[in-house]
Amino acid sequence: MHKVLVAIDGSEHSGRVVQYVIGLIQDGGLLGGSVEVHLVNVQSFLPTRIAQAMDSDELTRYYDGKSAEEAQKAIALLKQQRIAFTFHTLRGDVASKIVAHSKSLGCDSIIMGSHGSGFLEGIFLGSVAAKVIQLSTIPITLVK
């Protein structure tokens, strides 16, 4: 069974990533056959001042709500195509969490967008993508 971590952030690139994964699975390509999809959204920590003003339940609701919002389109696409997946919400440094979670799940590959929703989108290779490439020891597919 091929385990793939699909990293999404709610950006336009995330939609393309999910469409790419769907195509790989349905067309019997690289992921054809037996595949386990792990859809991952990582929320960066709020600034300390803001986080300290919130209690634990408020923080959990904030992170979970933001993650669900960012994953909504990706989840709908996968469900529409009847592709089984597990959704994971993580918190912290995005690139580090993606790589660490791929290791803990025993993933064979990571598929993610080449850019996210950052300020300089489209100008440079996204900083998260560049860091994941640097940290990961498994194959990574970047979707433009």
Where are each of the predicted segments found?
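Glycine-rich, Arg-bearing micro-motifs that act as flexible, cationic patches
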Residues: 112-134
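General small-molecule cofactor/ligand-binding pocket signal
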Residues: 38-40, 86-90, 141
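Short, flexible loop segments at boundaries between secondary-structure elements
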Residues: 135-144
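A short acidic, glycine-rich active-site loop
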Residues: 57-69
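Structural beta-alpha unit
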Residues: 76-110
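Small/aliphatic-rich secondary-structure junction motif
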Residues: 2-53
